[in-house]
Amino acid sequence: LWGGEALLGRPGCWVRRASLRTFRLPGGEKAGREPWRSAAALHWECGLEWAALPDTDGLARAAWDSGLNCPVTSAAGRLFDAAAAIICEFPNASFEAQGPMMLESVCRSAVDGMELPLRESDDEIFRTDWQPLLGMLADHAIERVRRAELFHASIARAIAEQAKALSAQNDIAQIGLCGGVFQNRVLADQAVALLEDAGFSVYLPLALPCNDAALSYGQAAEIAARETQQ
């Protein structure tokens, strides 16, 4: 399951060039309403245990160990779910993105984000490693507001670092941001500010939603672009 991607190119001609580190997601689509699954998966992926895990019967862990119904994902939304479950102690949601919305509402000010490792893999895709965030997210010695602010700032910084890495190879001047996570104004505002400071022209959706509601429009535009190029 893709997500958190950076695509290079133009309509009808895109190449996937950057992403987030992947992890196995126990329960697949269930994770959208059960953020604890994403939080647990991040810990397990790093060989750690999560003290607040609500999976008392061990079924989710057993499924994760065996790979049963555990699709591999790099979805940024699931990363936000995990952060909400850990910081806000919010294991279950009434609707998708409820946890990230709560996490956004906790933030009070912009801070300097953590630097996350960014490496180019053998398949020529830059991958941002979220693992350094885990210790901070679960550190109760840091007040909840500060942790929420650090998380948002770190993801915004990671977006900017991906853009700079790709621009160094491809001379990029324009960046378009889309996807449900950019409904989060804290993330969007910080990402735009960092990208503009780095010299990019940045675009956010205005006429259409930036989330899945505009997927069909984007698919139609992509098909039209490809047909025009033929």
PLM feature spans:
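Short beta-strand-to-turn element immediately C-terminal to the catalytic PLP-Schiff-base lysine
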Residues: 7-10, 85, 223
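Secondary-structure transition/capping motifs at alpha-helix termini
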Residues: 9-16, 46-49, 90, 166-173, ...
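Glycine-rich phosphate-binding/hydrolytic loop that grips phosphoryl groups
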Residues: 35-44, 153, 203-230
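Short beta-alpha connecting loops at secondary-structure transitions
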Residues: 15-31, 64-68, 200-206
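Active-site proximal loops enriched in glycine and acidic residues that flank catalytic Cys/His/Asp
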Residues: 10, 24, 151, 155, ...
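A contiguous, well-structured pocket-lining segment that forms one wall/lid of small-molecule binding clefts
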Residues: 41, 49-54, 59-64, 68-173, ...
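Conserved phosphate-binding/catalytic loops in two-lobed NTP-binding clefts
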Residues: 173-175, 185, 191-215
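Flexible glycine/proline-rich, aromatic-decorated loop/lid segments
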Residues: 1-20, 29, 33, 37, ...
